[in-house]
Curated annotation (Swiss-Prot):
It is found in: Cytoplasm, Cytosol; Membrane. Isoform 1: Expressed ubiquitously. Isoform 2: Expressed exclusively in testis and intestine. Isoform 3: Expressed exclusively in brain and intestine. Isoform 4: Expressed exclusively in testis and intestine. It comes from Mus musculus (Mouse). Isgylation negatively regulates its activity. This is Protein phosphatase 1B. It catalyses: O-phospho-L-seryl-[protein] + H2O = L-seryl-[protein] + phosphate; O-phospho-L-threonyl-[protein] + H2O = L-threonyl-[protein] + phosphate. Residues 23-295 form the PPM-type phosphatase domain. The modification Phosphoserine is found at S386. The lineage of its organism: Eukaryota, Metazoa, Chordata, Craniata, Vertebrata.
Amino acid sequence: MGAFLDKPKTEKHNAHGAGNGLRYGLSSMQGWRVEMEDAHTAVVGIPHGLDNWSFFAVYDGHAGSRVANYCSTHLLEHITTNEDFRAADKSGSALEPSVESVKTGIRTGFLKIDEYMRNFSDLRNGMDRSGSTAVGVMVSPTHMYFINCGDSRAVLCRNGQVCFSTQDHKPCNPVEKERIQNAGGSVMIQRVNGSLAVSRALGDYDYKCVDGKGPTEQLVSPEPEVYEIVRAEEDEFVVLACDGIWDVMSNEELCEFVKSRLEVSDDLENVCNWVVDTCLHKGSRDNMSVVLVCFSNAPKVSEEAVKRDSELDKHLESRVEEIMQKSGEEGMPDLAHVMRILSAENIPNLPPGGGLAGKRHVIEAVYSRLNPHKDNDGGAGDLEDSLVAL
């Protein structure tokens, strides 16, 4: 859904913070889309007495940003203030909600905010038909609660490996397809009624009006899946991202890339920016948002890794200069030509999971310095063929 620009918008929104024994950074980019429909939440210290809890989420809007933006501001409140979430507090003896009350309260919060937004005039009268996925993690001192509604995704890296990931809610999944068909719908070209690419979402009220069916039995359900994981010393980091990231990187590729970048920089905004840029250069045509939450055992900056990365940058700079000097007699080559030549070479120590796309910013900088009057497109469309093997 959504139209494309002639040239991607590569300006980024960034934020970072720390507390409760963790650090976070985030980055979002509009990219090739005509509108920016992503949103996010990052809260260290949850209100109403949960100061040692944190909450992070990414929302991937479609058909507009109304639902995504509202959820980014109000979903946490709907979760933490409903009676199910606070069930353990009724006796007054429990300082924190139980695991089961948290899971139930998260589900209730999603259903309540979805019901609440339905009454907004622009959503009720059909002037706004937007919807949004939501993927998040609520971190308590003892547990992580992973939350997913739609096809954004969260992954946990522990002991250097992906040890958990949420499951995308796609219409072709058997459980999702059965619900859609029971509600009188169909799955065509892997979409709900041939149109919507996700089977669970907030908003999307055009798909939630089947008489005699409850809110979780509609063509599109607002019910999240909630997973609890006991925290461990080996936990390194959590990545939350929209499908603009996952469309071009697997769980393992993204975690390998993040690990390698954490070894050369402790600036989490920079690491997230590298993720977004790399995905753009790998061919992503969607809005892109990523939130990185690092625990105390996350990879640390390594002198050896920094040296290796610096040597790689110098090698790439030298090769770009050589390619452009050699081609100069026939006219200055465009950036895509330079990238195609480099992609055919066996270049050691490229960022794992990112490949040459993970170093395009270095190549672009040299190219622009040597050819300042050439307009770099900053995009990925001209590189998809040359980078397909990376």
